[in-house]
Structure formats: structure tokens, C-alpha cells
């Protein structure tokens, strides 16, 4: 769902029911800002494109779940994503509950975006709380910008500490459970904090994922 191929154009135009005159400019283009860094410049169909992308992923998740359960109904169907929901739309993924409406919180979401949350499709969900600030109080002291691997630009806010991430995830996932993940190599030089992030994830989420377990075996 990431390309600007002729097929994607055709499918997107069918989805919105109209032709896109300037493609991909009416979706978005990369422009240099005053600092010489590339940033996205959204076009008039940017939000609908993001909606369409996440619909494709959620449709795939529904099909994949159907196949898995047909093979063995007892098998848990699950997934992993990063925890940084405010920018995760950039990779076409809406791992939230359909009961949560991101359009009330984020400018990139359409009113229809909520229809394509896939939390209710999965039995097992792990997410990456890969932050060195553990508590909200600690984050507010550092106010650090975080640039996750999927981000087009740096992010900031209480989403970007372990405690805050877990709180926000509870809000967007509603009654769906999640396991908070830790990135072990962030704490090689500070094992005390490794213990803190493990404790916080166990306290605020529904389990723990260790990424990558081979780092410590």
C-alpha cells in the first residue's frame, strides 16, 4: 500500500470515485524545508489516501485471520507494531479499536479512518515501547524528541515514554489487550533502567515482549 504505481492510482481512484488530476502531487510530495530537510507536503487527497492505505491493511488482516482460523481455530492470530500511533498512519496501519475515533485527536485522520481499526481482529498483540524515559514525569523533564524508524520526522509528547505510551494505548485499544515491548540494547549501559522498563510494561500493559531475546541469551 506504499507505492504510487499505476495500479495503486487506479484502485485509489475507484475507492474515492473520482480521477486524481495530479498524481502523486494531490496525495503528497517530498519538499525541503528551511533547514534543508525533506518533509511531506500533503495534497488535497492526503487524508483519503491514508484512509485507503489502512483499509487495505485491515482488509488483509481480516483475510489472514480467516485463513488461520480455518486451518486451526485454536491458534492465536496476532501481530506486532510499533507503539507510536500518532505517526503510525505513515505506514498504513491502524492497530486501534474501531471504537476509537482518531479524527478527534489527529488532523491526518478522516471521520471514516476509525472504521479500519483492526484491534478486534487479533488475539495476541505486542507493541514496541522502545523509550529510555520510563515515567511521564521523567519524560516531562527531558522533553526529548523521538525519531522512530518508521517516522518521517521527529515526534514529541507523552506518547514517547513507557508509562505514557501504555496509558495512551489503553485509550485507543479500548478493551483489547496488549503486551508492551522492550528494546534490550537501549539499556546495555544502564541495566537499572532495563529493570524499570520491564516493571513498567508489566504493570501498565498485559504482558511483556523482549526484543530481541537473542540479545541477552
Task: Identify the residue ranges that each predicted region occupies.
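Polysaccharide-binding and catalytic clefts of secreted carbohydrate-active enzymes
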Residues: 1-133, 137-138, 142-143
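Substrate-binding cleft of secreted/luminal carbohydrate-active enzymes
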Residues: 113-217
